[in-house]
Amino acid sequence: PRTKDFEMNPATADPTELDVSDLDLWRDGPPHEVFRMLRSQDLHFSELSDFPDEGGFWSVVNYEDIAAVGRDHETFSSKRSIILVDRLPAEPGAPDPIDISQNMMISQDPPRHDRLKALVQRAFTPKMAVEHTERMREIINLVYDRALEKHPDGRVDLVQDVGYFVPAMVIGEMLGAPREDAAQLVDWTNRTTAFEDPRMVTDLDDVWKAVEEFMPYVNDMVTERETNPTDDLTSAIVHAEVDGERLTHEEVLMFFFLLMVAGNDSTRSVFTSGMKSLMD
């Protein structure tokens, strides 16, 4: 009921009555009117969580506060992980989600976070982007050609036909994954990160199935590069040292997963949402 009130009139709603974890709020896409209202209030608000074991959480909605939180890792640590654990499907004997995520860079605080970030930061500088320009142009042309073959009238779906594939093929190639695996990588990352979206996942058991399929794929790539390094980003991570030590095999696996999700899902969302905003 609280969410319905916000949908009807977010401009006059009380921010303390909003539960941003209520899936109904997101049913028709991001609730931009609600976001604007929250930013105009210039405050933090406490979510009315339906998950008592989690105790609710704070939403930070304006730039100044977000910047302050980002600079203060002692007060706002990332070690607890970034997920609402109770929202994940549970299976007997399944690994603890927090334990898994704590092998990822985004669940680390400085100074280790900064050292892990430095391992890959050089691969995403403007200079490196220029060096990849021709390969990215080749990928974009390939994706557009395929989209036009699928839609001879020239009316393509920007998300399904373009946004799904360009970021996945670019980051996949940087990591050393074959281009032909792009669709499978998109499917795995969708199912493991969008487990509450009924358009992506209809059966929660399918989330764990995706993990069981994805991890052996990554494990094979990492194992191969441990003995036969190439010039891709996965090899660089495998053979890098942080604090004088190599990353563990599990840390490398989760690094690959993180980069694949960030380079695929996050980039796709920014690209397609940005295009929609420009068109609107």
Residue ranges and their predicted role:
Residues R2-D280:
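Cytochrome P450
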